[in-house]
From Swiss-Prot:
One of its GO terms (biological process) is cell wall organization. This is Protein FasE. InterPro entries: Ig-like_fold, PapD-like_sf, Pili_assmbl_chaperone_N. It holds the Pfam family PapD_N. GO terms for cellular component: outer membrane-bounded periplasmic space. It comes from the Bacteria. Gene3D superfamilies: Immunoglobulins. It comes from Escherichia coli. The gene is fasE.
Length: 132
């Protein structure tokens, strides 16, 4: 039993890194919620969300808001390409008379075709963030 444990430990130390040496790094939002702030004289309200791509390939980022019975919050850019090892800042502008803050922002990351192998399925990654 002692020899089996030693052999297993040597195997893990020598070859264990190969199982985690190539993880897929995908983009992610830096915050879990978006806080709307007033700028300047208080007339313009804006929220900011930073997106980071630590991976080696570019991704497509699509963003929109959901909720508040038809009131639309503007998100700029709504569709953008985030390059490898870079960041992107999304700006959120609510309606001026919007008192209801029960909105959600959805950020969808669409992977490039270069990551897909012929027998694999690629699935977009979506985050749903609270706007407060």
């Amino acid at each position: 039993m002692k020899y089996l444990f030693t052999i297993l430990l040597i195997f893990i130390c020598k070859y264990g890194y190969t199982f985690v040496s190539n993880p897929l790094l995908y983009p992610f939002p830096n915050d879990t919620k978006i806080i709307i702030h007033s700028e300047g004289n208080g007339k313009i309200k804006k929220g900011i969300l930073k997106i980071t791509n630590p991976g080696e390939s570019p991704w497509i980022v699509q963003s929109w808001t959901e909720g508040s019975e038809g009131k639309k919050t503007a998100v700029y850019p709504a569709l953008a390409r985030i390059e490898a090892k870079s960041s992107l800042v999304l700006k959120i502008y609510p309606q001026p008379n919007d008192k209801d803050k029960s909105e959600w922002m959805v950020v969808l990351f669409i992977p490039p075709d270069s990551l897909r192998k012929p027998s694999e399925l690629t699935i977009p990654i979506a985050y749903r963030l609270k706007i407060i």
